[in-house]
């Protein structure tokens, strides 16, 4: 049995925080895990900026409602789900993900939770598990799944290392340079070929 683990943002959907940064005109919010490997530092900074600017969960959701999956993502995911078990491992939040998951046909998603007050002001975030991507892949391997993982950012590299095969999808140059051991796919056709090459399905 095989399972393919995919990151969400940058692989199937646009980066939510970059889109929100563009819509609000706050460049500080454009920083992502492609730029900052320390996730807690990244999130604490985001929450501080949101509170400083008087922005909350409703403002972010409004932007997400207008977003769509990356071009070709739905077709790629449809093929992949017919080929292998698939799970999305993401450092996004359930409070963000619903509109995009609906457009992708409700794939299985493991992610985190935001803590917001009654007014929608973001107070904190709650991790499902520290380094949950890696821990999920480790658990799948323990369950005797042949695991293939694909992602684009620093926070994906531990799950790529834990999987039987790891693939970088459209990574920024700094990530590709620091992790040359992983093949790079720049299109869904290339990603499909890399997954098939690493598979034990057919």
PLM region descriptions:
Residues 117-125, 176-183, 193-197:
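Short, charged, surface-exposed secondary-structure boundary motifs
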Residues 95-147:
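Substrate-recognition "cap/lid" segment bordering the active-site pocket of phosphatases
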Residues 110, 182-191:
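Short acidic-hydrophobic, aromatic-tinged amphipathic segments that line or gate anion-handling sites
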């Amino acid at each position: 049995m095989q399972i393919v683990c995919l990151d969400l943002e940058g692989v199937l959907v646009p980066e939510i925080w970059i889109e929100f940064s563009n819509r609000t005109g706050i460049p500080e919010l454009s920083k992502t895990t492609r730029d900052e490997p320390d996730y807690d530092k990244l999130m604490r900074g985001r929450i501080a900026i949101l509170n400083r600017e008087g922005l909350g969960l409703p403002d972010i959701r409004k932007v997400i409602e207008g977003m769509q999956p990356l071009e070709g993502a739905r077709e790629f995911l449809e093929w992949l789900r017919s080929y292998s078990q698939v799970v999305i491992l993401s450092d996004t939040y359930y409070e963000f993900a619903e509109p995009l998951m609906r457009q992708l046909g409700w794939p299985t998603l493991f992610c985190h939770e935001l803590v917001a007050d009654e007014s929608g002001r973001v107070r904190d975030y709650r991790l499902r598990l520290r380094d949950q991507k890696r821990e999920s892949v480790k658990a799948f391997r323990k369950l005797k799944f042949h695991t293939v993982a694909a992602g684009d950012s620093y926070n994906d590299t531990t799950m790529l290392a834990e999987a039987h095969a790891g693939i970088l999808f459209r990574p920024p140059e700094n990530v590709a340079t620091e992790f040359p051991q992983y093949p790079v796919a720049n299109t869904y056709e290339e990603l499909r070929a890399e997954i098939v090459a690493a598979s034990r399905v057919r």
